[in-house]
């Protein structure tokens, strides 16, 4: 039995609150257990210089942790004037993941910024940011369609992310901080609603792992992805119709 009494294959409680920021074109507060991440989507009617005139959109993400997101205060990176390598890696991961399920030509010459701010960290912040960031993106696309700026959805399918790990001899789904810190093997899985893998990060922190363990961890992760996407569909309601659908604005 785990620290929080979950079974090995159990996700933590998933909570999704939409439209939590009145200024953003899309906003979601995602909670997975005690990890809480605020994700907002901002639409800019311009693209980076390398895409100008190409009738092609762009999606970019930024990620940050509030000073007291963790047990001990961590100073703001903006004050230090430099982002850590971890932050830059996570931002690139979120950006790649979201672009993988969007037809950027259909998005048009506009940029969608996804800002992910960790309010409270208890393991799995990057995976929660990907899932919450995608939902904020869907809400922003909903607004673009309702306003007539888009006539059909650029979103090809859903996407979510989850952590899996090996702690001792046990394979665990959705690790909390204590489990993550004790993990011998750490795996982050980003997967689409059709079961395609977008990103797989698997690292033997303190031990190696077998091919069978790798496949077993993937199976656990896929179960978690399905639960996250089901929760997302329930939370977004009618907006979920813009995920993987060719829709005409009427």
From Swiss-Prot:
It is an enzyme of class 2 (transferase). Keywords: Nucleotidyltransferase, RNA-binding, rRNA processing, Transferase, tRNA processing, tRNA-binding. It catalyses: tRNA(n+1) + phosphate = tRNA(n) + a ribonucleoside 5'-diphosphate. GO terms for biological process: rRNA catabolic process; rRNA processing; tRNA processing. Phosphate binds at residues 86, 124-126. The keyword Coiled coil does not apply. The keyword ATP-binding does not apply. One of its GO terms (molecular function) is tRNA binding. PANTHER family: EXOSOME COMPLEX COMPONENT, EXOSOME COMPLEX COMPONENT RRP41. Belongs to the RNase PH family. Homohexameric ring arranged as a trimer of dimers. Phosphorolytic 3'-5' exoribonuclease that plays an important role in tRNA 3'-end maturation. Removes nucleotide residues following the 3'-CCA terminus of tRNAs; can also add nucleotides to the ends of RNA molecules by using nucleoside diphosphates as substrates, but this may not be physiologically important. Probably plays a role in initiation of 16S rRNA degradation (leading to ribosome degradation) during starvation. This is Ribonuclease PH. The gene is rph.
């Amino acid at each position: 039995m785990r620290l929080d009494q979950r079974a090995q294959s159990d996700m933590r409680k998933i909570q999704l609150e939409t439209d939590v920021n009145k200024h953003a074109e899309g906003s979601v507060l995602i909670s997975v257990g005690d990890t809480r991440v605020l994700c907002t989507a901002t639409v800019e009617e311009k693209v980076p210089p390398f895409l100008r005139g190409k009738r092609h959109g762009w999606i970019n993400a930024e990620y940050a942790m509030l000073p007291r997101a963790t047990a001990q205060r961590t100073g703001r990176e903006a004050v230090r004037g430099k982002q850590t390598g971890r932050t830059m890696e996570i931002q690139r991961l979120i950006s790649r993941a979201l672009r993988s399920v969007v037809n950027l030509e259909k998005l048009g010459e506009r940029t969608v910024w996804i800002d992910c701010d960790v309010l409270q960290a208890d393991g799995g912040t990057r995976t929660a940011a990907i899932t919450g960031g995608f939902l904020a993106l869907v809400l922003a696309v909903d607004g673009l369609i309702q306003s007539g700026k888009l006539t059909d959805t650029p979103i090809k399918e859903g996407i979510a992310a989850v952590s899996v790990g090996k702690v001792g001899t046990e394979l665990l789904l959705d690790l909390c901080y204590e489990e993550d810190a004790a993990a011998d093997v750490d795996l982050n899985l980003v997967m689409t609603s059709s079961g395609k893998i977008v990103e797989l990060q698997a690292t033997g922190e303190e031990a190696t792992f077998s091919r069978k363990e790798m496949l077993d961890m993937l199976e656990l992760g896929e179960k978690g992805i399905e639960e996250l996407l089901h929760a997302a569909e329930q939370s977004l309601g009618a907006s979920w119709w813009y995920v993987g659908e060719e829709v005409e604005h009427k």
